[in-house]
């Protein structure tokens, strides 16, 4: 059972009175503001999400933090992506895109395309260029594992190039600049989706 203690602020300062040993400080409410700083001196976990996974954010789309200093970080998702302006469609995850069209990227409709940009990410662990504005914005995976639409026979470890229809295909002797990534799993069918790894060729 959680024991709640009153929050006591020293008059004329930003200090918070120390709680009894072993007790947690719980801040709740829809708007907690004007906090100068919070100093953590304990070796235990400092900030805990008490409402369940995928609930709550640090910062917002309109209220940024500046720089995050940390020893390490972890994420559940598996790729690093960057936002790009797409032409006239909101492409589904796994679609192979190239640098062409009326915007920055478009669906790749050329086989073994040398202007290939990458694969639309489904859920990036880290998204760059998040402030990009436009009608059609797609996250393109730059590094890590990502689902990719493929066609034809693919063996695990195969180098993947564009197939000319928004999909990728295996290629044993790709030309420079055409490789999207390597297959993490095999596939034997017409069109489907498998995981590939991009950025480590």
What positions do the PLM features span?
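Intrinsic low-complexity, repeat-rich intrinsically disordered segments enriched
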Residues: 1-88, 173
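Extracellular receptor-binding modules and their adjoining Ser/Thr/Gly/Asp/Asn-rich linkers
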Residues: 13, 66-201
């Amino acid at each position: 059972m959680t024991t709640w203690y009153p929050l006591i602020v020293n008059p004329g300062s930003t200090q918070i009175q120390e709680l009894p040993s072993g007790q947690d400080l719980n801040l709740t409410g829809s708007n907690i503001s004007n906090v100068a700083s919070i100093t953590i001196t304990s070796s235990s976990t400092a900030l805990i999400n008490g409402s369940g996974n995928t609930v709550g954010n640090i910062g917002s789309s309109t209220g940024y933090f500046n720089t995050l200093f940390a020893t390490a970080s972890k994420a559940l998702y598996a790729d690093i992506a960057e936002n790009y302006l797409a032409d006239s469609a909101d492409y589904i995850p796994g679609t192979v895109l190239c640098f062409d069209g009326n915007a920055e990227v478009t669906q790749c409709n050329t086989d073994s395309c040398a202007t290939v940009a990458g694969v639309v990410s489904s859920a990036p662990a880290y998204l760059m260029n998040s402030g990009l504005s436009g009608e059609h914005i797609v996250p393109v995976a730059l590094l890590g594992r990502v689902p990719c639409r493929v066609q034809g026979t693919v063996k695990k470890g195969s180098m993947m190039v564009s197939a000319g229809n928004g999909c990728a295909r295996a290629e044993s002797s790709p030309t420079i600049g055409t490789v999207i990534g390597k297959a993490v799993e095999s596939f034997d069918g017409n069109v489907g989706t498998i995981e590939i790894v991009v950025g480590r060729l």
